């Protein structure tokens, strides 16, 4: 059974200005905490499209949301397919969309899923258990240069080359099969002095591999682009991110759509095509409260950004 404390639960949903008869999309159903809070505000005419690529999360959510099942459509898919999902459901536009990005606590806490550097398990890290690519393939089969690139880009790890070299040397002897085997190899690639600073030495590499396995950043970019088109005028999008790469991507995309295209000089009236698509509701991200942090330490890195659609 999932046990998951949702981060910034009220803020994420309240900023959507929920309408009783509205149609909303939860792109990251997870433990269903946000979904339950939203559904409690929806009337019988309202509807929630709940997306997750993890079938375990969906099965658990059906239990959590059992009193509201008549208002929920569950979709096992990647959120990068929002347009396709809504088309299949004959929904043209929705009133709001929200994301709670990152790994849900249950995925981290179930050792067999291979996300955690604290528990020994087979290298896996697949959010969608039906996909073939896992952390094992990334660690044991990807070329040195490709490993360096993902460690640097997705983990912002300054010892990317040294760690990738250690992985290459170790896997030539025998495959690196478990999370703790990988942790040991990562430690070999980081100077002792640096290992003692900045949290767990494997944290950034595990993040990078997880992002690569699940293609998280490009999936989010695709999804957010589609979400901006899928929301009605005056509807909103809430996004909770957990690391700087996602937050930067979200911030930049909101800024681009808020700015709109460059307007040709000398036009007496600005055509609608040149007006902004959205406005940012909060210029600076909302961060977790002390209360949030007491309930869930993972909220420490969470940032919430909200945008309102203008046309």
Swiss-Prot record:
Enzyme class: transferase
Compartments, record wording: Cytoplasm
Single GO biological process annotation from the record: rRNA base methylation
Gene3D superfamilies: Putative methyltransferase TM0872, insert domain, Vaccinia Virus protein VP39
Function according to Swiss-Prot or TrEMBL: Specifically methylates the N4 position of cytidine in position 1402 (C1402) of 16S rRNA.
Catalyzed reactions per annotation: cytidine(1402) in 16S rRNA + S-adenosyl-L-methionine = N(4)-methylcytidine(1402) in 16S rRNA + S-adenosyl-L-homocysteine + H(+)
Main location (coarse class): cytoplasm
EC number from the UniProt entry: 2.1.1.199
GO cellular component: cytoplasm
Family: Belongs to the methyltransferase superfamily. RsmH family.
An MF annotation (GO) of this entry: rRNA (cytosine-N4-)-methyltransferase activity
Species this protein is from: Staphylococcus saprophyticus subsp. saprophyticus (strain ATCC 15305 / DSM 20229 / NCIMB 8711 / NCTC 7292 / S-41)
Protein name (record): Ribosomal RNA small subunit methyltransferase H
